Amino acid sequence: MEGPRSDVGRWGRSPWQPPTTPSPEPEPEPEPDRRSRSRRGGGRSFWARCCGCCSCGNRGDDDWGPEPSGSRSRGTSSRGRDSRGGRRPESRGSGVNAAGDGTIREGMLVVTGVDLLCSRSDQNRREHHTDEFEYDELIVRRGQPFHMILFLNREYESSDRIALELLIGSNPEVGKGTHVIIPVGKGGSGGWKAQVTKNNGHNLNLRVHTSPNAIIGKFQFTVRTRSEAGEFQLPFDPRNEIYILFNPWCPEDIVYVDHEDWRQEYVLNESGRIYYGTEAQIGERTWNYGQFDHGVLDACLYILDRRGMPYGGRGDPVSVSRVVSAMVNSLDDNGVLIGNWTGDYSRGTNPSAWVGSVEILLSYLRTGYSVPYGQCWVFAGVTTTVLRCLGFATRTVTNFNSAHDTDTSLTMDIYFDENMKPLEHLNHDSVWNFHVWNDCWMKRPDLPSGFDGWQVVDATPQETSSGIFCCGPCSVESVKNGLVYMKYDTPFIFAEVNSDKVYWQRQDDGSFKIVYVEEKAIGTLIVTKAIHSNNREDITHIYKHPEGSEAERRAVEKAAAHGSKPNVYATRDSAEDVAMQVEAQDAVMGQDLAVSVVLTNRGSSRRTVKLHLYLCVTYYTGVSGPTFKEAKKEVTLAPGASDSVTMPVAYKEYKPHLVDQGAMLLNVSGHVKESGQVLAKQHTFRLRTPDLSLTLLGAAVVGQECGVQIVFKNPLPVTLTNVVFRLEGSGLQRPKVLNVGDIGGNETVTLRQTFVPVRPGPRQLIASLDSPQLSQVHGVIQVDVAPASGGSGFSDAGGDSRSGENIPMAYRGGA
């Protein structure tokens, strides 16, 4: 088991406060000038490394024939034209470049250009499932071949030698996989090879195979040739850079997924649902992952750079996912998002106001500063974007009644005084109403067999792991079976989903005694978006055995035996005959409500129960405020009878105390006079917020302006001030912020906006509203975008990205 985690992070009792001004790290060192790099590895040493079996240099230069005297030369050629002067479509390359005196000798094999077939409609992008990326460069997935065309100054001959080069990082080395040499027509090392598929005189069609273990990232690309007349090297051209990603379609890749519908959902879907609230009152919001938006891929790679992750480790999905979990939060390393659970978001954006990841990631890429602010669903949404973009099958997961174990006991310990009133100064463990993290799919070669598949990655900074704020990847299978000694961070994740809630009461002598153990209170429902639908999928069964089953109890006790309180189960008391259930009325914010406690006597004797009810507001992280209403009542139950106690709560009573998410916590404790049985229950519930209503105004066509109408009714009798709308949708609208001023109490407003779709197909346009008085207001509409006239699938026009406009309302009305 790993060492204990630190007591700093994402709950209210922490002394940590978000920094007023995030401080960026120094930017990464600039890479050496491309021209100096183009000379690296030239001449005899380069060709010696073109061994057909490996890069060991066992083949000497003589294998390529004697080097002609004075053969190293430099020359030029018109970009985009073949040797006959005709226009060469889609050609890339800006001339020629060879070491030496700059002379192009007669008979030298000169590469005048390269076509990487990298447009979105070309074969490479379609076959590699990268055609949705809003990039002009070639983007391929490792372990899968791609095609290119070399344009030559003369016909290719059997005696000619051609080698492709891929380089990444500031100091590329063959032994570290950062300098890849691929001899054309010969087998390379580690699965790299290039074959001629068609020789059309001056054009050479190649099929290039990449290694399924290749480093991911953006590679520089060049071509070298050697002939009897001399050597030549194509100069580096930024337009010829190649992105290589993980490949869930490749059986040899560690991230391989053997279900096409999973790949479509968990790799290619650009939007999804994130669930929040409480188990009894589940809320859902649509999130724009936007992994294919222009700039997002560069932002994802920048994250690895900012962490200083060695390039040699970027081919390992376990290492990459762990770095991502550390870098999506800002603690330790000035990562992407600043966490804030204080309720004061005046120096940034309320976490509830975000509608997607694109604005966050592009801001981080553009400025290098951590973005304020995030909470668990924002960290998870951004993590899904980053991992899907890099090629992981990833989903966003919500765990309701998620425990936060601060002392590695693997139990949730709650302390009460003699009258069963919570002792908040002792209650360091907390139960979050919900917590959102990620599952990503991969093999685990670093673990024994049986732990492949879904792995938990959690970027929310709760506790440290190996000294940094990260969590995972952790095998879900190890969590299910209580194998808390498996890396990474299994004890913490196990406690989140399957620990027991232990109630301790202070005795007359000051000691504490266990008076109640609630075995079914933690991890009560674990959900994610279903494949190919907006329905909710219950995945609790993959995290834990059926609640109360022998296998589930074994897993809990096995895990607890490795915790800091291994003997907690030895002190448990006898069975009970009075059952208690808590219910809360489903209410919208601004309305009155009621909470009820139902008692049932399951025994054969009369029972008298003395109840205490304490009501307070609570953050979704389990941090509660002071009690603002309480009630006491004695209930007498005949054998087999039930009775209820109801406590009404008026809007004016809870309004002054409301915090984020509109959640409340009811602490109920009771004592059965006849048997001494102790009753205890904590019940959270939330006030619902309204939705935004979105209506499309006309048909959506690529490259043509389209309108949308947004309608909102203020449910509160008070004015909403400084109201901000956000609008975003991949392929439709770049992130847009709209300042609309104030909205009166119970007022209905209508807002109209336009956007220009840039990609066809079904899309999601997502909006949110935020103000100091009301947040967590969202809306979404599906937009089916038709291709532009003429069949063009994509538009070069970008969505309107103006930000911070003051927008007049199209219509204002009363209640």
Curated annotation (Swiss-Prot):
One of its GO terms (biological process) is animal organ morphogenesis. PROSITE patterns: TRANSGLUTAMINASES (PS00547). Ca(2+) binds at N498, D500, E547, E552. Its main location: membrane. It is a lipid-anchor. Expressed in large amounts in epithelial tissues (lung, liver and kidney). The modification Phosphothreonine is found at T21. It comes from the Eukaryota. Tyrosine-phosphorylated. Belongs to the transglutaminase superfamily. Transglutaminase family. Catalyzes the cross-linking of proteins and the conjugation of polyamines to proteins. Responsible for cross-linking epidermal proteins during formation of the stratum corneum. Involved in cell proliferation. This is Protein-glutamine gamma-glutamyltransferase K. It comes from Mus musculus (Mouse).
